[in-house]
Amino acid sequence: MGKKNLYLLGAILLVVAAFSSCASQPDKAVIERYFHAIQLNDVTTMSTIAVSPIDIDFKSYEITKLGETKVQPAALPEMTKKEAELKKKLEDHVGPTLDAKDVLDLAKEELDNARTRPAKAAAQKKVDDLQAKYDQEYELHKQLQKDYNDAKSAAAREEEISIFSLGEKEVPNIRDLTGEVQSKEAEVKVITKAGAEKTYLFQLRLYNLKDEILNRTRRGRWVIPDIKSIS
C-alpha cells in the first residue's frame, strides 16, 4: 500500500473514531455542540440544546469532569399530584383564615364599645387572644401559599424540560407520562478571550417517557436544563 493511501486510510480512521466517540458519549457531545454554536454565534442552535441558553466568553474550553449518569423514574406525575394536593390544602384553609379574621374584627368592635374599665380589660384580653390565633392562621396560610407556589413552579419547570427533551412544541398529556429520566452534571473549564479561567456547571438530562394509554414510547435527547458559573 502506498504512502498516500496510508495517509488517506489514517484520515478515514480518525473521522470514524471521532464519530464513534460522539455516538458513544452523546451527553458529552451535546456540550461540544453547544460551545460550537457559541463560537458561530448560532443562537438558534443554542436554543435547541439549552432550555435557558447563555452566551459564554471563551477562547478555549475543556470538559474536566463528567459525572455518573443517574436514572430515576419520571417525576412529573408525582409533582403534579403534589401540586394538586397543596392547592386543595390552600383552598381549604381560606375559610378558617377568614373566620379567624371576622371573629377578631368583632372582638375589636366590642373593645371599641366597652365603657367600663373591667369591660375594656376583658375585651382587650379577648382581642389579644384572637389576634394571636389569627396571626397563627395567617402565617400558616402564607406558608401553604408558598408551598403551593413552589410546587407549581417546580412542576411547570419539569414539564418545560420534559417537552424540550422530547423535541416537541407541546405534549397535551405530558404530566401523565411515565418512564425514566437520566441526569448528570459536567464541569467545564473555560479560558476567556482575556485569558481568565472560569468553571461552569452544566446540568444534563434525557427523558424517555411512555404513554400508558396509547402504549407509545417517546424517546428524548440529551439537553441542558441549566448552566451556571461556579468559579
Language model features with spans:
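Bacterial signal peptide processing site
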Residues: A23-Q25
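Short, charge-rich amphipathic alpha-helical segments embedded
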Residues: I54-Q72
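Alpha-helical linker/edge segments of TPR/alpha-solenoid repeat scaffolds
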Residues: A74-E91
